[in-house]
Amino acid sequence: MLTRAGPLLFAGGFAFLLFVLLAELPFGDPVMAVGRVVLDEAAATVGAANIVTSVVLAYRGIDTMGELAILFAAATAAGLVLGHPGKADQAEEAGGFILRAGADLLFPLLIVVGMYIILHGHLTPGGGFQGGVVLATAFVLPVLARPGQVPSHGALAIVEGLAGAVFIATGAAALAYDHEFLTPLLSPGRLGALVSAGTLPILYLAVGLKVGAELAGLLIRFTEADAESPR
């Protein structure tokens, strides 16, 4: 009886929720008071041509820091589940010529593309999260081609820690000038210029390096766990 009543209760509650929402919210007339203010003032106030960057780092930068904390917690939990990285299996053969040559060719390209996406995040769509994923891919591909050559987890941890410290320090510096935490400092500059938007490019660089180091370490740990598992 309870098994049958559960889906019915869920469906009834969901239908009631939809009814309340449709009855209270006017259809076709969304309330965008905050959005209009951001669209009208972000470019002149923050100096970022990419309005999304203004929202992510300036208007709700504390949420972005929370997202970084969630990513750190997820990577830490995954690392604990996988266990301490053991010694890489030296007997495991490297990939074929095409895989090795492709990884060697793509590594510098991915580094350049990743840094470009990060450093231009305040000008064009992209930013630290997207560029960080590209940077992580650049360091994971060589591991897939040559399993015996694994980047140092200690070096990745240092980069991750320093990037996080720079993000928090940049945000805390605003407190010294009697501003809110993570308020953009420095001059907004000329809209559309590479050196503009105050400290937002610094924050995005910290985000990109932190995301790249965390994701690269996690994916490389996955490859190590697969190599250590019995065949």
Task: Mark where each language-model region is.
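Alpha-helical transmembrane segments and their helix-start/interface "positive-inside/aromatic belt" motifs
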Residues: M1-F16, S152-G164
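A structural-propensity feature for long, helix-poor, extended segments
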Residues: L156-L186
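Cytoplasmic juxtamembrane regions at transmembrane-helix boundaries
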Residues: A75-A101, A225-R231
